[in-house]
Amino acid sequence: MSSGGLLLLLGLLTLWAELTPVSSRKRHPDCDKPPDTKICQTVVRAFYYKPSAKRCVQFRYGGCNGNGNHFKSDHLCRCECLEYP
């Protein structure tokens, strides 16, 4: 194999190694828990991941710190809870 072919192979292997962890990321286990809707402090708008819908949904969060399935924004919820194929 020529040196150009070896460099191409090395480049492709490096790219594959970099992309593999991103494409196989799984969601956090807390994303499967139901939203905590108890009122303990000030009620704020938050988002939780709804597994049956496979998306993030807005809800009223009462500040009780019940579980990790509450996020300040839809974007943060999606980053933490959506699976990547």
Curated annotation (Swiss-Prot):
Expressed by the venom gland. GO terms for cellular component: extracellular space. PROSITE patterns: BPTI_KUNITZ_1, BPTI_KUNITZ_2. GO terms for molecular function: serine-type endopeptidase inhibitor activity; toxin activity. Disulfide bonds join 31-81, 40-64, 56-77. It is found in: Secreted. Residues 31-81 form the BPTI/Kunitz inhibitor domain. Keywords: Disulfide bond, Neurotoxin, Presynaptic neurotoxin, Secreted, Signal, Toxin. Residues 1-24 form the signal peptide. InterPro entries: Kunitz_BPTI (IPR002223), Kunitz_BPTI_sf (IPR036880), Prtase_inh_Kunz-CS (IPR020901), TFPI/VKTCI-like (IPR050098). Coiled coil: none annotated. Belongs to the venom Kunitz-type family. Beta-bungarotoxin is a presynaptic neurotoxin of the venom. The B chain is homologous to venom basic protease inhibitors but has no protease inhibitor activity and is non-toxic. Heterodimer; disulfide-linked. The A chain has phospholipase A2 activity and the B chain shows homology with the basic protease inhibitors. This is Kunitz-type serine protease inhibitor homolog beta-bungarotoxin B2a chain. It comes from Bungarus candidus (Malayan krait).
